[in-house]
Amino acid sequence: MSDLRLKRRSFLETLLAIPVGLLAGQQKVQPSGVGVKVAAGVDRFNDVRKLPGGDLVFVKVATQDTAGAFFLTEQPISRKWAGPPKHFHYEQDEWFYCLAGEYVIEVGNQRFELAPGDSVLGPRRVPHAFAFTGNTMGKLLVGFTPAGKMEEFFRELEKRGRYFGEGTGADKERARQYYGIENVGPPLSP
C-alpha cells in the first residue's frame, strides 16, 4: 500500500508541475512602474503616424507600458470619414471615447451616435465599424484590451497606406491570422 501511495504522490507531483513549467515560459514583462506623460497633440514615441487617407494617429498608451494589457490611440480627424471596414477582433475588446466632433459606431446590429464625452465598447468577436460624421474637427480615443498586436498593426497600416480589407485575399488572410482581425463588411457611410 505504501508503494502505491508513493507512486500516486510522484505521479500527482509530476502532473501538477507540468502547468507550472508551461506557465514559466509565458511570463509577461512587468510594467516599469514608472509614470509616462504624453503631451497633447503628440505620439508616445514622438512619431508622426498616419492612417490610410492621411489622418494622424497618436499612440497614447503603448503596449509595453502595460505589459500587453492595454493599448490606446488618439485619432484626430478633420473631414467626414468612412473609417475602417466593418471588422471584429478575435482577442481584443475595442473601446471608443469621443473627445470632439460627432461619430457613428456600429457594434453588432446596434448603431450609436457619439458626441463629446460618449463612449462605446465593441466586444471581441462582435463586428463593428465607425465613421466620423461631424462638420468640425473630431478626436476619438480608441483603446484595445488586451493590446495584442494592435500597436504593430497600426505601424503596418501606415506603411501599407490602405486597410487590409481593401487588399487581396492574401492581405485579408494575413490580417486574420497574424493580427486576429477579420473584415466582414464595408466601412460605414459618414
Language-model regions, residue ranges each:
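N-terminal secretory signal peptides and thylakoid transit peptides that target proteins
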Residues: 1-19
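C-terminal segment of N-terminal export signals and the immediately downstream linker at the start
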Residues: 25-56, 159
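A short glycine-rich, His/Asp/Glu-containing loop-to-beta-strand
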Residues: 49-86, 92-93
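Short beta-strand segments
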Residues: 84-86, 107-112
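Glycine- and acidic-residue-biased ligand/ion/polar-headgroup-sensing regions
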Residues: 93-103
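Short acidic-glycine-tyrosine-enriched beta hairpin
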Residues: 110-124
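Ligand-binding loop in jelly-roll beta-barrel domains
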Residues: 124-151
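Acidic/histidine-enriched, glycine/proline-rich intrinsically disordered or flexible terminal extensions
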Residues: 156-190
